[in-house]
Amino acid sequence: MKNINPNRTQAWKHLKQHFDDMKSTSINDLFNQDKYRFAHFSKTFNNEILVDYSKNLITNETIIKLISLAIECDLIEAISDMFHGEKINCSEDRAVLHIALRNIKNTPILVDGFNVMPQINAVLNKMKQFCNRVIQGNWTGYTDKIITDIVNIGIGGSNLGPYMVTEALKPYRNHLNMHFVSNIDGTHIFETLKNLNPENTLFVIASKTFTTQETMTNALSARNWFCKATSDAQHISKHFIALSTNTIAVRKFGIDPSENMFKFWDWVGGRYSLWSAIGLPIMLSVGVSNFELLLTGAHDMDIHFYSTPLHENLPVILALIGIWYNNFFQVETEAIFPYDQYMHRFTAYLQQVNMESNGKCVDRNGCPITYQTGPIIWGEPGTNGQHSFYQLLHQGTKMVPCDFIAPAISHNPISDHHEKLISNFFAQTKALAFGNTHLTSMQKYIQSKKNYKHEQCIVPFKLCKGNNPSNSILVKKITPYTLGALIALYEHKIFTQGIIFNIYTFDQWGVELGKQLADSILPELKYESMISKNHDSSTYGLIHCYKSWCG
């Protein structure tokens, strides 16, 4: 994989010139110039997902120049390298193979000359057997009661992905009650456990290293709660399982690794791991067949990404449009608005995948970067956000490109709720793009009011300038298949941007510094020792105040 500084490419120079030509263009002008603009700037995926990117400040020339940038940055070779098991995560000397986890066609994928598919299939089969036993009531607790509650203890990728998917697929859930504990704040584990019965509760401890501070602190508290109720640590084997690679630590905890540990590999990044054993809570929640459909949807998007020409390639198109705004319009954020309540954790999930992946300031050569890399990702489900921050989107001074996502078919077609929801989706993308600045329509509005003079005075305050870009992603229905495809769509968008940014998307060294400092500060809070004089005055003052208040 080549290391190419994007802003030294010819394509980047051409895009800067093109931006100078485009910056005074309006979305309204673009639609007026092309009555078939929707047809020209929208694509479907397997007749299940429609991506409409027509409400963007782009032309055919923009797309051509952006694709030239992708080609000059050697995106096609980078895609091939990932799919063929090359160690593209060079800072950690690892392959990047979440795509292998959903390789349902079982095509051989080699890492260091070894086909990884047999070991993937072995873990997947072990997951299926275990989940079927729990779901069917054949796995019982220490008093022979069936399991009714699953508590997943993990953080980051070991929590966000499984939690998001189980929430998004609630219509497919079985009888098991799912709980997710991530925060080291004792309130999280306390509030989760206080209404549970240890006799029918199963704990899933999800940690690759089995040393993650937050996860193991919560896991030990859960084990203490369980042992206090049962008075016998031997019963742990029926109520605790591990998703990990650390056999020694898992056994020390009291879990039998040969039976109750589900492994994964160093080429699976945490934020890309819901397809692996980390996805076991998903399989427990929705069953084996639905988990397989989730994998199938992602795999089909993988094939689309790998084999489709760049100008037809949905992840590539979305990535390039994002770079257009991020690096030429200099916007700093992207908003994601799922108009589906089941998808309420989708933005938080993508926030981690994107910001932990592409929030980097050093390029693949180890040099400081002089251009913007990953954007800030934020958002809320619609229509809640409309009564919160959409005011800024419509009349503020910042450009915020938005992705609107909604299903055409609702799982809960109550009265006309869904039609009203979708009408808001369509209305918001239209209002953001076109505003209400058309003189004739404003005059008609003013003339329709009784207090004509007053309305004339407040016209400037009611004007919405429009020209705010958005993508509309309409899904036929949120199913395991379409959700898998949608997640993979964004994964590959992020990968594409990372290649063009010339960064290592799959490491996260910035997470480590805070962990190290917390480990050094912890003894100063727990014991009567003196506070280190090596702290800055702010940290010293905070620790001193904390200790004085806590006695």
UniProtKB/Swiss-Prot annotation:
EC number(s) on file: 5.3.1.9
Keyword Phosphoprotein in annotation: no
Catalytic activity line of the entry: alpha-D-glucose 6-phosphate = beta-D-fructose 6-phosphate
Pfam families in alphabetical order: PGI
Gene Ontology CC annotations of this record: cytosol
Gene Ontology molecular function, alphabetical: carbohydrate derivative binding; glucose-6-phosphate isomerase activity; monosaccharide binding
Name of the top EC class for this enzyme: isomerase
SUPFAM superfamilies: SIS domain
Transmembrane regions: none
Pathway of action: Carbohydrate biosynthesis; gluconeogenesis; Carbohydrate degradation; glycolysis; D-glyceraldehyde 3-phosphate and glycerone phosphate from D-glucose: step 2/4
Annotated catalytic residues: E356, H387, K515
UniProt key word Isomerase: yes
Function: Catalyzes the reversible isomerization of glucose-6-phosphate to fructose-6-phosphate.
Protein name per the record: Glucose-6-phosphate isomerase
Organism: Blochmanniella pennsylvanica (strain BPEN)
Encoding gene, per UniProt annotation: pgi
